[in-house]
Amino acid sequence: RLSFEVSDRYVLARSISDSQVAAAQVGRDSIVTRMNEVFADGGTVVCLPSTVSPAPLIGQKVSARHSLRLRNSALTSIAGNTGRPQISLPITELEGMPVGLSLLGDLGSDAMLIAMAQEISAAL
């Protein structure tokens, strides 16, 4: 059985038109172009928060979780949309909840990104 949120995404996906897919592809291509510019010099690693806020509380309203998921997608979809590796590290806590730092690497930088994550983790 799927949760409401997952079921809702399937229903939404079935309603997407070809023109909406084409428009989304234009947006995705724009993201890829921008990330190609960011990583053009080689050796770049982008550091960004893993999420926009600590994890939602158990029992939080669906509407609040939906809003959080939409805001988080701006951070969490970059790697998937561009084919780049991303790793998230638990860096600290805020009010007892983990706060993560994501490292986003260039195409093919997986091993370097893992090594960097290991160094950061060892230093904490």
PLM features: residue spans?
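Glycine-rich, N-terminal phosphate-binding loop of Rossmann-like dinucleotide-binding domains
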Residues: S50
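Short helix-loop capping/hinge segments that flank enzyme active sites or metal/cofactor-binding pockets
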Residues: R1-D29, S88-M97
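Short, surface-exposed loop/helix-turn segments at secondary-structure junctions
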Residues: A23, A55-S73
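Short, high-confidence coil segments that cap the C-terminus of an alpha-helix
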Residues: G42-T44
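Structural helix-boundary/capping segments
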Residues: N81-L124
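Small-aliphatic-rich amphipathic alpha-helix that forms the alpha element of a beta-alpha
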Residues: H66-L89
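Short gly/ser/thr-rich secondary-structure transition/capping motifs
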Residues: Q25-T33, L68-R69
